[in-house]
Amino acid sequence: VGRRAGGYVMTYSTLASIVKYPFSSQHAGAHGKFGFFESEASSFQRIADELGLICLSAPGEPLRYARHPLVYLMEAADDICYEIMDIEDSHKLKILSFEETRNLLLGFFDDEGQANILRRLDDEGVTDRNEQVVYMRACVVGALEHACVNTFVNHEDEILQGTFTGSLIKHIDTPLREAYQRGVELSRAKVY
């Protein structure tokens, strides 16, 4: 009762939006990443055809498609949340000091942005360091989200034509991209 045959019964758009690597397992190569097994190629081809995904493979080659546009947004959300949440978690676990965490998170903002964040914490009477980190983390996530949306809009034609390369996070404006990269490097050095 209450169950449907076929599992989740996701829409084609939902399925396509979570396939980060829209190509057959035969294209996996050294990195071992692919979106579907060769045995599922006809099912994915049906989805791709219905959604108008751009086929990048020549006839007779294993299937390879351009990403569905929503994949870029899903990937950005994943990149942002994992990286920034790991910083917050590292502070809670005392892997990173409060000063390291604070400097890293505030480093996503210019002087005015930093002053606004610190003023808000002061105005609200937030003295608990964990709560301060939570607020700064939320500000960073919001800034990165906004930057990725802008990048998506600015590169919409390339994304829709299947010519956009890389992730949205790698194309955001330099100050945020550099701050994000500092977080990645610190995580590799001290967290993982």
Model-assigned labels for residue ranges:
Residues 1-136, 145:
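Sequence-structural signature of the catalytic-core scaffold of metal-dependent phosphohydrolases
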Residues 113-192:
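C-terminal subdomains that position terminal phosphate/3'-OH groups for nucleotidyl transfer/ligation
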